Swiss-Prot record:
It is a peripheral membrane protein. This is Photosystem I assembly protein Ycf3. Belongs to the Ycf3 family. Keywords: Chloroplast, Membrane, Photosynthesis, Plastid, Repeat, Thylakoid, TPR repeat. GO terms for biological process: photosynthesis. The keyword Plastid applies. It is found in: Plastid, Chloroplast thylakoid membrane. TPR repeats lie at residues 35-68, 72-105, 120-153. The gene is ycf3. The lineage of its organism: Eukaryota, Rhodophyta, Bangiophyceae, Galdieriales, Galdieriaceae. Essential for the assembly of the photosystem I (PSI) complex. May act as a chaperone-like factor to guide the assembly of the PSI subunits. The keyword Cell inner membrane does not apply. It comes from Galdieria sulphuraria. It comes from the Eukaryota. Its main location: plastid.
């Protein structure tokens, strides 16, 4: 039984039934349907903090999914898990892969900026000011791209860019 079929609450059960019906009648190939099922199970596991299970499902979905747009969200979610686990290099790699598949993914741009900003703050704390400035610059570049795609989002980033003279 897939994870999504084990949901307890009414909303999750309703969503699962509707998603299963859509999958059943959607005119798409079997691999795309399987990929979506793994993706959905990955999201469910991720929302419950079951990151190992989520990653296993996302990797299965990634192997089956052919559509670059859909693949970008799988890659993005893998990046989220690595970032949550403090694996920032891996997270950056997956966010960049997500952007290669779909360059209009502001949340990936934002998360890359957040990681660079975090690393810049850490570099500042140990007085590595040259590295800090380079990382702050990278963060600014990614936030500018994210804001360009989603102007009403990332207000804190916009304020930081303004207050530091980067916007």
């Amino acid at each position: 039984m897939s994870r999504s079929q084990k949901n307890d609450n009414f909303i999750d059960k309703t969503f699962t039934i509707l998603a299963d019906l859509i999958l059943k009648f959607l005119p798409t190939n079997i691999n795309a349907k399987k990929a979506f099922s793994y993706y959905r199970d990955g999201m469910s596991a991720q929302s419950e903090g079951e990151y190992a299970e989520a990653l296993a499902n996302y990797y299965e979905a990634l192997n089956l999914e052919e559509d670059p747009y859909d693949k970008s969200f799988i890659l993005y979610n893998i990046g989220l898990i690595h970032a949550s686990n403090g694996e920032y290099v891996k997270a950056l790699d997956y966010y960049h892969k997500a952007l290669e598949a779909n360059n209009k993914l502001p949340q990936a741009l934002n998360n890359i900026a957040v990681i660079y900003h975090y690393q810049a703050v850490k570099a500042s704390e140990i007085n590595d000011l040259e590295t800090a400035q380079a990382l702050f610059h990278e963060a600014a570049q990614y936030w500018k791209q994210a804001i360009k795609l989603a102007p009403s989002n990332y207000i804190e980033a916009q304020n930081w860019l303004l207050s530091t003279g980067r916007l």
